[in-house]
Amino acid sequence: MPHFTVVPVDGPRRGDYDNLEGLSWVDYGERAELDDSDGHGNHRESSPFLSPLEASRGIDYYDRNLALFEEELDIRPKVSSLLGKLVSYTNLTQGAKEHEEAESGEGTRRRAAEAPSMGTLMGVYLPCLQNIFGVILFLRLTWMVGTAGVLQALLIVLICCCCTLLTAISMSAIATNGVVPAGGSYFMISRSLGPEFGGAVGLCFYLGTTFAAAMYILGAIEILLTYIAPPAAIFYPSGAHDTSNATLNNMRVYGTIFLTFMTLVVFVGVKYVNKFASLFLACVIISILSIYAGGIKSIFDPPVFPVCMLGNRTLSRDQFDICAKTAVVDNETVATQLWSFFCHSPNLTTDSCDPYFMLNNVTEIPGIPGAAAGVLQENLWSAYLEKGDIVEKHGLPSADAPSLKESLPLYVVADIATSFTVLVGIFFPSVTGIMAGSNRSGDLRDAQKSIPVGTILAIITTSLVYFSSVVLFGACIEGVVLRDKYGDGVSRNLVVGTLAWPSPWVIVIGSFFSTCGAGLQSLTGAPRLLQAIAKDNIIPFLRVFGHGKVNGEPTWALLLTALIAELGILIASLDMVAPILSMFFLMCYLFVNLACAVQTLLRTPNWRPRFKYYHWALSFLGMSLCLALMFVSSWYYALVAMLIAGMIYKYIEYQGAEKEWGDGIRGLSLSAARYALLRLEEGPPHTKNWRPQLLVLLKLDEDLHVKYPRLLTFASQLKAGKGLTIVGSVIQGSFLESYGEAQAAEQTIKNMMEIEKVKGFCQVVVASKVREGLAHLIQSCGLGGMRHNSVVLGWPYGWRQSEDPRAWKTFIDTVRCTTAAHLALLVPKNIAFYPSNHERYLEGHIDVWWIVHDGGMLMLLPFLLRQHKVWRKCRMRIFTVAQMDDNSIQMKKDLAVFLYHLRLEAEVEVVEMHNSDISAYTYERTLMMEQRSQMLRQMRLTKTEREREAQLVKDRHSALRLESLYSDEEDESAVGADKIQMTWTRDKYMTETWDPSHAPDNFRELVHIKPDQSNVRRMHTAVKLNEVIVTRSHDARLVLLNMPGPPRNSEGDENYMEFLEVLTEGLERVLLVRGGGREVITIYS
């Protein structure tokens, strides 16, 4: 089948993306088994345009209405049968479910693949929400707001959200540019940018997902040991300054335990992870709703979370109960626990007290003043700290005095140095996860609709949550509490939990389970991503990771993922792992934007995204923003990430990635000279890269001027899709004598190309025979990969009026040459009526009459024409023909679905052509055609000797006038006759070589000729189709039509021309199209 009927339902496989799309047609008629069958159980004639002897066999062609296209139907399918087979195949390989749909217990029978059924909400929107919301929202956003201030925090959120939104726009364009099978984001990037970039970015994406698992696990451990079960800690600080080391060691031990457990869960079965995904998502949503509920409640009833201040310094509340220096117990003033910490004595002695403690008062302020308290103004500005700085509240009185070093653990201090760039790197992971929807592309009912809508809505939703959360935190929570990363000043409560309603535990438990769920999702997705890369076999040493369990589970890839995640666990700091994660995701997003920009600027014919709201400038802005964020957040991490990607790229290039995925980078090769030509030499272009590379065959008049300049106009309008254009012509004669003439003709053509704005090359050859010259052009034009795949040939006007067969012989021979060379052929008829480049069609239709599948040329050409300003306003209509046994209603539905996947906007109409009796007009028209052929033959062969001699003289004088650049020499018998100089010898020669029994004795007997039945059927096809086409498309700006193939034997050449004339009668502008034997359009991205 052609490439768009892709994966049979009964045996889906993953990883064979490069095998999904065929490059050439197969014989749909199964001719090897049944030579006289059309593949539908009906008999047909073995050759079109049969001789009378063959017609006398009485073989009746199965479909009278399509008799003219009999030869095409030998090797190409009818539209009805093509669409029928299309709907019986699934257009998607299965996604994550394919591993569960493994072989049954017997090991020989696979479960039937279910049709993808997930919609936008469940398939894209909610998974994106779950992956975007994560540990940073609950553990670091409040700290970021307090440190950067509300204004700079909003700026950080804006930059990061703009980056992901621009990336989502580019991703939506790529995702809707055809069907994206399972493989999701990696598939899109690799098939758009090629194996080198695809492998490098794919591995960066894999490493990012793997480190995300480590980050989520570290977040879960932080919540567990800090807020849920602090006594569970294994390591305790040995001294006042050893808290950091003890915390890191606890994170490493518990992180390793959690990672091992999660890896075992994923190994046992991904279905358990998917079943709990909804629960984890519910935890996230409930937690966020509780934050908003708490913010609203704080307006009239703020929660009680007092913060103890010494002067303007924040004290760590988990070490004492009473926020005062002294307390009255039984009418006696005694020292509090706080006094003993600062004075190292339980008594009220001041000898060894901390000077700052003695000079400043201890006060208590509300940690959550509420939205009505006006703290927003205080929290607008930044308060960046260095490592070890004490968190202070501006505005509180404070006596300047030295503080003892031993007292430092009693304060809330900054554990890391902060700046705007550091916060960007830490926050960015909280906006990643936008590709969760595209990763499930194999499970979506309509990925081209769901991915853009769901992803962009999820980004807008999460962005609004982040923006509102920044403002809410700044308006409700005291600044010193916001800057308190671990909640030490509010009795080791999660800061965001202090605001939540009805209880802080809602946030604590919800965030814990959501981070655990996100970690499981990352450990599930990363091995499958590595498996997809390994199965593509672009990085040889990763090949082992493409294997797994019997049911397809990537066991070895899971093991490697766990080992890499363990490296992140050993770092043991959420704030250190987050920037690493940011680098890899930013690298991935950068190349998504690059892929979209490259495809848009190259304007490849296959670049037809259904998502229209993209622009190359937006993609470049997104790419620049990603690059800037990489270096802003951590320039050394950025260099390391780029170095890793560069090394992978060069390794794949060094290994020689012999993959052809139709990547956009190959389009750049057309402008890269020798290196590019050598690359293009490697093989035929992928279907996605196919564009009409034109060879325009021009006819020159006696003064070497272009006879039909509108052929060049048409070529320039068609090449709005860019690509290669070669303009060729033939000068008849000797090369030595006509070299100067050829140079003059070439210059004339170049001038005309410049006038018509045709960017390409010109080649004029000198040949003794025009037919041979054209054949040489068709065979040898171009260099390496820059070769033509389509020929534009002018129509032989006036062939009916000419008695000389050279008027149309060369045309048919050229058609045969293009067919033999497997080139597409475009024949614009009535070229003088085609629009110039200065005209504009403000309305109208381009009508496509799709009768026989030709590889998609008929679909692609109108799309390319509509890229030009002349045709841009025209709408596309596609007509196809239904026969008696076709379900026209179903055909229309199938055709609409097919066009939807091709990303083509067109009206669809199925025209029913029922079998009808051959009309008297058809019979008469056929009779006239055959009588004319016989008459012309007789006029050439049955003259008297005197008439022959006069005719010979006349021929010699008229030959120069009748001869054209596209006409060939006379038949062999005529050539042989001309070589004999003596009149008597020539006549004798003709008399001896012609048997009068082969033709009627005189013209009167012509009326008794009975027309050949095969010609009657073909004439019937031409007449009926012409009637239908003229009725439906008489007002169309352009009509595109399948061009029937020429007869296999030359006896029917003249009749073939008549059939084409009848087929196109009454139409102002017609483009006859004949495919080149390969697919040129695809539903895949």
UniProtKB/Swiss-Prot annotation:
One of its GO terms (molecular function) is potassium:chloride symporter activity. The keyword Transmembrane helix applies. GO terms for cellular component: lysosomal membrane; membrane; plasma membrane; synapse. Changing I223A: Decrease in Cl(-) efflux and reduced sensitivity to KCC inhibitor VU0463271. Its main location: membrane. Glycans are attached at N245, N312, N331, N347, N361. Residues 665-681 are annotated as: Scissor helix. It is a multi-pass membrane protein. Changing M215A: Decrease in Cl(-) efflux and reduced sensitivity to KCC inhibitor VU0463271. K(+) binds at N131, I132, Y216, P429, T432. The modification Phosphothreonine is found at T983. Chloride 2 binds at Y589. Changing L139A: Decrease in Cl(-) efflux. Pfam families: AA_permease (PF00324), SLC12 (PF03522). Chloride 1 binds at G433, I434, M435, Y589. The keyword Ion transport applies. Residues 1-119, 173-196, 441-450, 532-554, 599-612, 652-1085 are cytoplasmic. The chain crosses the membrane at residues 120-141, 150-172, 197-225, 249-271, 272-297, 420-440, 451-473, 505-531, 555-575, 576-598, 613-635, 636-651. ATP binds at L697, K699, K707, Y708, V730, G794, W795, Y797. InterPro entries: AA-permease/SLC12A_dom, KCC1, KCL_cotranspt, SLC12_C, SLC12A_fam. Disulfide bonds join C308-C323, C343-C353. It catalyses: K(+)(in) + chloride(in) = K(+)(out) + chloride(out). Mediates electroneutral potassium-chloride cotransport when activated by cell swelling. May contribute to cell volume homeostasis in single cells. May be involved in the regulation of basolateral Cl(-) exit in NaCl absorbing epithelia. Homodimer; adopts a domain-swap conformation at the scissor helices connecting the transmembrane domain and C-terminal domain. Heterodimer with other K-Cl cotransporters. This is Solute carrier family 12 member 4. It comes from Homo sapiens (Human). The gene is SLC12A4.
